[in-house]
Amino acid sequence: MIKVAQGEALPPQESITLKGLAIECRITAEDPNTFTPSPGKITKYVCPGGRNVRMDSHIYQDYSIPPYYDSMIGKLIVWDTDRNRAIHKMKVTLEQLIIGGIKTTRDFHIAMMENQDFINNNYDTNYLSRR
């Protein structure tokens, strides 16, 4: 039962201990340079895995990506004990992800994980326009 719904107070925010960091990359069926849609048939699919790695997706080998809908084909999520480790884990996990037959934003996300501004936590919403 939710204690707050019973009228109990929440503990103060200061009592919450942060434990690690998660990163999510939204993999889309798009050209990684122009972000134009890339519909077509997936000829090969290798889903990464491992401790604290999660891939939420509906795709599979021989699946056809239609041109009519949202191009997102998966969410790749990793967790590790700190930001630098999470970035490294995401890069390695992205390199293990194989989606053949269509263009995807996988390589864009790999480049982001290697980008020194991103690694140094020095980025903003204008990142793509400066790319």
Regions from the PLM with identified roles:
Residues I2-R131:
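Catalytic cores of soluble metabolic enzymes centered on carboxylation/carboxyl-transfer
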